[in-house]
Amino acid sequence: IMRRFGMVVELSPKRITIKKGGKPESSISVEPDWSSASFWLSAAIMNRDSEILLYDLKQDSMQGDSALIIIGEELGLDFTNIEEGLIATNTGKAPSFFSFDFSDTPDLALPIILACAACGVEGEFSGLSSQPLKESDRLVAIEEIVCSLGAGFVKTGEGQWKLSRRQELPGQITVNGRGDHRVVMSAAMLSAAGIGVIVENYYSVSKSYPGFWEQMRQSGFRGEEL
């Protein structure tokens, strides 16, 4: 990206040298945030009839969280690039088991693990050591929500957790948003699995995604403030 702005960048094993460069490209588009797309892709994973368009996102991305493409494909999504962005389609071929190391993509853990729990997918996950250090202790949040879905989530090692398969989904769950924007948005998307979700302390989405609730309504989700 810096080279596209005309900078001269020299990389060595221990040093990055940036020199004054030439003229940047006439126009540079900024790619949307892949981590925000994780909530919509979790909804697509949970709903077998889903097809969503992620505007201005492409499979060829420099963002680490674009690992969502690999995750999505393993969890039954098919991706198609079009001019407007990226279409994700649920193929109805969800696996019975899924494993992933979230060390490089910690913000994806919440929505993906919850989607697996809602879909009845068993899993083994690693790279979760940083989750208690986020806006809330997200491991506690995951454990509570997973249990409310009728599944289990137990620690098996340092940063390693195992997800057991749920039984029957409940008709409705209540989630404490913990003042954590990602807990709130991940929990809200569980409604794509066909259950009612009451989210307490939901205002925190304004930190990273102020238009989240309006976009949910525009996408056909129904909700009301209690």
Question: Where are the model-predicted features located?
Answer:
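Short, structured segments at the rim of ligand-binding sites
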Residues: 1-226
